Every structure is written in structure tokens, then in C-alpha cells.
């Protein structure tokens, strides 16, 4: 059955997330894309389930601040995204705690720090397992819930690295994983056409702290290849996340929104 047209007509009502439950994985950092996606959803009234892998204190601090500032319910969960059984346990627990999941933002991931030749086989396996297989695990677990309830929105954090091979860093495993995430979203959009929408967001260089270990010379080279001349701020992504989880995007599925300051136009 085709998914219905929303009953709301006003734009603010279409973007509203009041009464909805949104999951955001990888939202334990102080200035990352995950916490900004969660913040955007909280601003629009959503209750939230946010996850962490190792930074429990960071996730709990973020949850406390979101509840205090926006008056929404926020619960924190530890999840090993590379273990399907743990992901399934987590999704079932969220449904038990909140009664439903309306949208799932699969944002958690790992970065690569070596190329194919210089890196180990386990380095490759780790990035692919977390970034691609882990995202697929999230999709599989929440997809079953979406199918049962008859609606849902899955948003995958991909990367501009799924469109281009970044220079000069060697991160083939990451590029491959993120390209896979983009096509995963497109494929699931078709597979889930009767009960859920699936889209991806491909950020460019965003100041989240994850690249702080990169030397300044390399970072200057990155910026020189961005038409807008600067890195992005994580808050510049939250509007896209809110759009894709809300009824404002009710006819959007299989899309990939590139937010990279123009990097991939070169």
C-alpha cells in the first residue's frame, strides 16, 4: 500500500515532531553530528533515544541538557553497533521504553587511519563492520518494527567520501563503507516502499573534533578544495535531519543530501 499524504498543511506542522520518538545513534560527543541531529529533533518536540559506544558520561550529559532545555524525554543506551544481537536488543528495549520508534538516525561510525596496503586486515574489517554492516544491522532491526507499525523513517549518515575519494588522506575502507551506506539507503527505499522511507545525508568536512589529530597543513589543503572556503559546523546539518525524519519529507525516499560546502562540485 502506498504511504499516505500527511494530513497537516502548514509548514510548521509538517516539521513538527511532537509526539514522535526518534533514535539517534552516536550522540555522545559534545559537538558532533549526532548530538546536533538529536538537538534539532528535540527542538521540534521529539522524545529521543540516544546511544553511545564508550562515552557514557558524554551521552548522559547530552541527554540531561536536551531534557532541561526542550522538556522532552531522553534516554541513553549503550550499543555495540557491530553486533547484530546487541542492536536488536537495543531496538526492542527502545520500543519497550517508549512504545514505538517513528524515526531512526543511523549516525554512529568509525574513521579510518590507514590505507589498504599499510593498514592491517583487521583495520579494514573494523571500519567496514562498524560503518557499513553496523548500519545495515540498525536498518534490519528497526525495519522489522517499522514494517509492523506501518510507518517509519530511516536516515543514514553517509559522507561525501561515498561520492569521491578524498585527497590526500588514505581512507579507502571508509570511502567504500560510506558509498555502501548511500546505496544501502537507495536499495532499502525500494525494499521498504510500502511502510517506511529511507534516505541518507552525506556531510563534507565538519568540525566535530574527530579530525583534530590531522596536521594543520593537511587541513589547510582540505579547506582550499572547498568552494565555500571553510569547514562546516555540525549545527548546519540538523535542519536536514529534521526534514528527513519529519512529515515535511513525506514524498522523499531514496535521496542522498550532500552537505559539503560544494566540495563534490569540483
From Swiss-Prot:
Induction (free text): Exhibits low expression levels on L-arabinose and L-arabitol, as well as on D-mannitol. Transcript levels are shortly up-regulated during the initial stages of germination.
One Pfam family matching this protein = adh_short_C2
Instruction: Offer an example of a GO molecular function term for this protein.
Output: NADP binding
Instruction: Provide the residue positions that the database annotates as binding NADP(+).
Output: 53, 107, 140, 174, 178, 206, 208
Changes seen on gene knockout = Does not affect growth on L-arabinose and L-xylulose reductase activity remains unaltered whereas D-mannitol 2-dehydrogenase activity is reduced. Deletion does neither affect the germination process nor the hyphal morphology. Only during later stages mannitol levels are slightly lower.
One of its GO biological process terms is: mannitol metabolic process
Q: Source organism's superkingdom?
A: Eukaryota
Catalytic activity from the UniProt record: D-mannitol + NADP(+) = D-fructose + NADPH + H(+)
Q: Which InterPro entries match?
A: NAD(P)-bd_dom_sf, SDR_fam
Q: What is its EC number?
A: 1.1.1.138
Q: Transmembrane region positions?
A: none
Instruction: Write out the entry's keywords from A to Z.
Output: Carbohydrate metabolism, NADP, Oxidoreductase
List the active site: 159 (proton donor), 174 (proton acceptor), 178 (lowers pka of active site tyr)
Describe the task this protein carries out. Answer: D-mannitol 2-dehydrogenase which is not necessary for D-mannitol catabolism. D-mannitol metabolism occurs via at least two different routes involving mannitol dehydrogenase (MDH) or mannitol 1-phosphate dehydrogenase, and the exact physiological role of mannitol dehydrogenases remains unclear.
What protein family does this chain belong to? Belongs to the short-chain dehydrogenases/reductases (SDR) family.
- Quaternary data: Homotetramer.
Record-given protein name: NADP-dependent mannitol dehydrogenase
Instruction: Name its species.
Output: Hypocrea jecorina (strain ATCC 56765 / BCRC 32924 / NRRL 11460 / Rut C-30)
Q: What is the lineage of its organism?
A: Eukaryota, Fungi, Dikarya, Ascomycota, Pezizomycotina
Protein's gene = lxr1
Amino acid at each position: 500500500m502506498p504511504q499516505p499524504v500527511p494530513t497537516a498543511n502548514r509548514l510548521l506542522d509538517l516539521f513538527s515532531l511532537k509526539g514522535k520518538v526518534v533514535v539517534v545513534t552516536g550522540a555522545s560527543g559534545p559537538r558532533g553530528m549526532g548530538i546536533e541531529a538529536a538537538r534539532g529533533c528535540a527542538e521540534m518536540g521529539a522524545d529521543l533515544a540516544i546511544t553511545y559506544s564508550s562515552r557514557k558520561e558524554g551521552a548522559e550529559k547530552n541527554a540531561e541538557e536536551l531534557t532541561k532545555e526542550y522538556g522532552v524525554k531522553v534516554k541513553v543506551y549503550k550499543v555495540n553497533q557491530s553486533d547484530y544481537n546487541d542492536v536488536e536488543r537495543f531496538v526492542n528495549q527502545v520500543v519497550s521504553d517508549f512504545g514505538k520508534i517513528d524515526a531512526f538516525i543511523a549516525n554512529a561510525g568509525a574513521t579510518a587511519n590507514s590505507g589498504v596496503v599499510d593498514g592491517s586486515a583487521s583495520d579494514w574489517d573494523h571500519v567496514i563492520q562498524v560503518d557499513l554492516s553496523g548500519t545495515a544491522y540498525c536498518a534490519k532491526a528497526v525495519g522489522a518494527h517499522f514494517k509492523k507499525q506501518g510507518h517509519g523513517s530511516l536516515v543514514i549518515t553517509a559522507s561525501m567520501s561515498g561520492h569521491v575519494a578524498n585527497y590526500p588522506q588514505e581512507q579507502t575502507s571508509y570511502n567504500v563503507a560510506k558509498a555502501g551506506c548511500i546505496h544501502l539507503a537507495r536499495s532499502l527505499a525500494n525494499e521498504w516502499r510500502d511502510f517506511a522511507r529511507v534516505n541518507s545525508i552525506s556531510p563534507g568536512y565538519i568540525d566535530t573534533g574527530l579530525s583534530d589529530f590531522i596536521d594543520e597543513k593537511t587541513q589547510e589543503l582540505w579547506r582550499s578544495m572547498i568552494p565555500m572556503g571553510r569547514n562546516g559546523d555540525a549545527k548546519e546539518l540538523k535542519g536536514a535531519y529534521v526534514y528527513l525524519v519529519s512529515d515535511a519529507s513525506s514524498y522523499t525516499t531514496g535521496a542522498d543530501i550532500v552537505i559539503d560546502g560544494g566540495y563534490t562540485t569540483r
